[in-house]
C-alpha cells in the first residue's frame, strides 16, 4: 500500500520482481566482483562520531574498490525527510524511510552506511527486520561514546542549547537513548582513533564475507608469536637446513615485517604466476604484487629437501626462519627476467643475480624467529609498517605522503616534498606528515651506499630544508631491482602498509640505462602513468613529480617553466656526482651545504679506498 495526497492508502500496488539477480549485479558493480550489498547501521548519541566514522569507512571501502554509500542524518533531512520534525512520530517515520532506502541500496549491491542517532530500539529492530525479510545482511554498530565526551565535542552547540532549555526532547539530555542490547559491533570512539574504529568495522565485514581479506588494512607479520617461540627454537635445531644469501635474507625481512601483505611467505607457483602474468594476487580479492618474491634453490638442495614438511633457512650459519609445506617448481629465469625487466641481458645487475641463482624456486609459509637486524648502526631507522603506523598516530597525522629514494636529496627534491605538504594543507588536512623512505636493501655498486645516504638525508633535516617536525625518516628494507614501471608499483604498494595515502613518484622511477645501448630501458614517464592505472593501488593517491631545475635568477631550485627556459640550469645526477667527485661546490641553493659536504666526503673516501 502507499499514501495518496489526500491521505488515503493506495491498494493497487504490487511488488515487482526484478530480472537482474544480485549475483549478476555484483559482477559489474565495483572493482572486486561479487555481491556485497548490506547495511551498517551506526547508532549513538549526537557527537559520538557516527558520521565521522561512516565517512571515513566509506572513503576506505571505495578506495578498496568496494561500492559504498553513506546516508547521513542531517543530509537526509535536507531532502527526502525535509517535511519531518522531531516529534516521536516524525522520528519514527524518519527512521522507517531511511530503513527502506538503505534496504534498496543494499539490494543494489552497495554497502550502505547509515549514521543516525536512532534512539529507539523498536525503530532499529524495524530496520533490521526489513533487511532480514529481504535476505540482506544488517549490522548494528553502536558508537558507544560517553555523554560527557559528546558534550565536550558539541561541534554544533546542540548540547549547550539543550542544557539551556532551548531545545526540547534532545537525546541524552531530556530524552532517553535506548542502548542496543546485542549490537554486531560496539565502537568505543571516545578513546580510539577514527582509523582504529574503521578497521574494526572492516574486520567485522570481512568475517561476514562482505569484504575480502585483501581489503582488511592489517599488516601480516610473519614472526613466530612469543607463545610459540621456545617450541620453534627447539624444533628448528632438528630440521634440515638450507643456507641462503644476503639478498634472500633481505627478502625474508621484507616478508616478515609485513611489507608484502597478504603473502604468508615466499611465493608458491600459483602466486608466482599471478604476479608474473597479472601483476596482482587474485585469491581473496585483487592485491597489487607486480614483482615476484621468490626463493631460488640449487638442484642439490632441491633433491635433498624435497619431501620435507618443513626446513630451516640459515644465513651466515644462523638459523633464522622455518619454511613450512614447501613447494618446489621450475625457475624459468629468462622468461621471469623478460617479463619483469623487459630484458634478459645479464648486464642488468639484478638480472645477472637471477641468472646465477638456482634452477628451482621454493615457496612456502614463513615463520621467522626474530627480527632481522644488520648491526650497522642503522637498525634504529628500520621501522616496520606497524611501527610507522604507530609513529604517525603519535604525530596525529591525518595524511601521510611517502617519498621513495635511492639517491642523495637535493633542494629540488625538497621543493617537491614541501610543495606537496602545502597542497595537502590547502585541501584541508591539518597535519600531513612526510615519510622520507630511502631504500635500504641491495643496490648496484655505483649507487651511493645506504650509510652515506642516511647521513646526507639527516643533514637535510638538520638544516631544516625539510621540516623535521613533520618528517619521519625510516629505511625501506627492500632490495632494488631497477625494473622500472613494474617495480615502482611494488614501491607504492609496500608504502600502503605504513598507512601512507599519498605517494610521490618521480621521473624514470626504478630506471637505468640498457647495459649495451646505454639508452633508458624504460620510458621516463611510464612509471607515473602506470601508477595511476595499476590495479590494487586505488587507496593511494599518486603525486606526480614536477620537473625542478636550478633557477639562476633566484639562486634556488624552482619548478621549471619552459617559457622562462633561459633562467634555468639543469644539473643531472651524473653531473652532480661528477662535481662531488671533483670536490667542486655546486651553485648556491642547489643542496644544503652540510649535505653537499657529506657527498664530497663519500667520493673522496671511495677514491682513497680504490
UniProtKB/Swiss-Prot annotation:
Keyword annotations from UniProtKB, A to Z: ATP-binding, Kinase, Multifunctional enzyme, Nucleotide-binding, Nucleotidyltransferase, Transferase
Q: Which InterPro entries match?
A: APS_kinase (IPR002891), ATP-Sase_PUA-like_dom (IPR025980), P-loop_NTPase (IPR027417), PUA-like_sf (IPR015947), Rossmann-like_a/b/a_fold (IPR014729), Sulfurylase_cat_dom (IPR024951), Sulphate_adenylyltransferase (IPR002650)
Residues reported in the UniProt entry to bind ATP: 44-51
Q: Which reaction does it catalyse?
A: sulfate + ATP + H(+) = adenosine 5'-phosphosulfate + diphosphate; adenosine 5'-phosphosulfate + ATP = 3'-phosphoadenylyl sulfate + ADP + H(+)
Q: Which Pfam families match?
A: APS_kinase (PF01583), ATP-sulfurylase (PF01747), PUA_2 (PF14306)
Tissue expression, as annotated, is:
In adults expressed in coelomocytes, body wall and gut.
Q: Recorded GO terms, molecular function? A: adenylylsulfate kinase activity; ATP binding; nucleotidyltransferase activity; sulfate adenylyltransferase (ATP) activity
Pathway of this protein?
Sulfur metabolism; sulfate assimilation
Q: Where is this motif: PP-motif?
A: 506-510
Stretches the record annotates as Sulfate adenylyltransferase: 206-610
Active site located where?
A: 118 (phosphoserine intermediate)
List this protein's GO terms for biological process: 3'-phosphoadenosine 5'-phosphosulfate biosynthetic process; sulfate assimilation
Quote the EC number: 2.7.7.4, 2.7.1.25
Region annotation Adenylyl-sulfate kinase: residue ranges?
1-205
Against SUPFAM superfamilies, the record matches this protein to: Nucleotidylyl transferase (SSF52374), P-loop containing nucleoside triphosphate hydrolases (SSF52540), PUA domain-like (SSF88697)
Entry function: Bifunctional enzyme with both ATP sulfurylase and adenosine 5'-phosphosulfate (APS) kinase activity, which mediates two steps in the sulfate activation pathway. The first step is the transfer of a sulfate group to ATP to yield APS, and the second step is the transfer of a phosphate group from ATP to APS yielding 3'-phosphoadenylylsulfate (PAPS: activated sulfate donor used by sulfotransferase).
In the record, the note on similarity to other proteins reads: In the N-terminal section; belongs to the APS kinase family. In the C-terminal section; belongs to the sulfate adenylyltransferase family.
Protein name, please? Bifunctional 3'-phosphoadenosine 5'-phosphosulfate synthase
Q: State the organism of origin.
A: Urechis caupo (Innkeeper worm)
